[in-house]
């Protein structure tokens, strides 16, 4: 149910873009979003067992945080080199979409930032920063819907065992929606006006701390 709260948050922030897609569904942006979704679905289905094991064990969390940091730094470096020749939405190609969608598939792993990797992919392809953020969050819609469908059976079984959808679930969903609205707006502003270097440093330090705890201190892992 938390996924639904996040989905509503995306709709709240990007309602103009979503309405434009609904009014004119057979436009190029729709085709790009579909193309980007294909590799995500393929990766999710092909590595389903591996992904579930990663979620349950948590053994790869530290490396995933570090990998996210490296990708973000690399994307910002590439984007800075080509800042004078930024490509717009009209310039995005289907290979661009496939690359971004593949990164979204990789980001199914628990400690990999979906928005971070997809935005980084767009920046690495020299796409406009504002469009990179918009495309990333629009692309999250089919991904979130897929996750909801994928977990529908577990949700139904949990609801039946617990006597229905309880107050904590409702509160969690509403909280996810409120936090999601703030997170989407904040991320889009950072991407448009700033840099992902701060977030890269954060996840990099977090990755080091997690690895130290997993292999030395064992306070949490």
State each model region's role.
Residues 1-221:
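Multi-pass membrane proteins that catalyze or facilitate reactions on polyprenyl-/lipid-phosphate substrates
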